[in-house]
Swiss-Prot record:
The gene is REIL2. Its main location: cytoplasm. It holds the Pfam family zf-C2H2_2. The lineage of its organism: Eukaryota, Viridiplantae, Streptophyta, Embryophyta, Tracheophyta. Can form homodimer. Interacts with RLP24, RLP24A, RPL24B, EBP1 and JJJ1. Pre-60S-associated factor involved in the cytoplasmic maturation of the 60S subunit. Involved in the dissociation and recycling of other late pre-60S factors before newly synthesized large ribosomal subunits enter translation. Can complement the growth defect of a yeast mutant lacking REI1. Required for leaf growth under cold temperature conditions. This is Cytoplasmic 60S subunit biogenesis factor REI1 homolog 2.
Amino acid sequence: MSGLACNSCNKDFEDDAEQKFHYKSEWHRYNLKRKIAGVPGVTEALFEARQAAIAQEKVKAVEAPMLYSCGICNKGYRSSKAHEQHLKSKSHVLKASTSTGEEDKAIIKQLPPRRVEKNNTAQLKGSIEEEESEDEWIEVDSDEDLDAEMNEDGEEEDMDEDGIEFELDPACCLMCDKKHKTIEKCMVHMHKFHGFFIPDIEYLKDPKGFLTYLGLKVKRDFVCLYCNELCHPFSSLEAVRKHMDAKGHCKVHYGDGGDEEDAELEEFYDYSSSYVNGDENQMVVSGESVNTVELFGGSELVITKRTDNKVTSRTLGSREFMRYYKQKPAPSSQKHIVNSLTSRYKMMGLATVQSKEAIVRMKVMREMNKRGAKSSVRLGMKSNVIRNLPNNVTY
């Protein structure tokens, strides 16, 4: 025993020359790769059988493909094994028993090799030069016009997608998807079963748009109506509904939050009736004292005249639309919905409008809580003791 061996291949050697020759072999390299991967090595016989199988597959890939067709069934196969299985099938045996011996012949044909189309750079350059040499020119708009058209198309597509995907019914409950015939019944249902309360309902001018906006926030954006300062959406509609039900957040964060939160809902309210001066006269915003002339729709001319006391406007139109000008339909108002809900809130003893004292008291309490929290943190840092620890912490 010379004591020379290979640990990867489990083979002994008689001299150094044989060992060095083994280290240069493909078998030893293959076993080294398996050893690095944590897999045991293979014997030399198994490695040679594997190499022979790989070489045979390469030869088959290089050889031209053959088509084995059956004269009786008129079917073709690309491999001999599939053709042999077809010959043993019941359908082929039944047809062979009823047919004559002339048709029972296997036809073997050589398929033409596949042509691989390679894009040569010279051919590409030639085709490009031919295209450039053609005298077919098309006038195009400037870049600004193209960008404007693309932006308009994109906006129209976005509006269409929003309208299709998120068509919300304002008469449908936000919490249980129960549909009602009118918006009034829907708002009464949400207040009775879910505690939904609308602040300053006396000044609500658009109940339909108000409920549609809240429905988009809950059903599309998965955002809570009350604790949405950070606008962190939930994972699903059921998650945000469970959160609002458990926390009692089935209400609108309006009147007691910041200016940014109130600005979201200001367009649905109209506080002009509450602006009263000392003489009990309603105060309105005075416009610019400039006379204006506006054209609407290409068929009407509106002349507006502003003075110190009043604003007058006249409309000049075509005679063909006189039958429409004579009609005076009553303006559609949603005030009856607001009035019914206001009376319902008052019957239950709920304040529809917050008093100034309550708002001032709320701001003072909020400021006191902030100062108390800061002082407790400062005292805890100074004494190196954290006061608000869990009950299971004894120190």
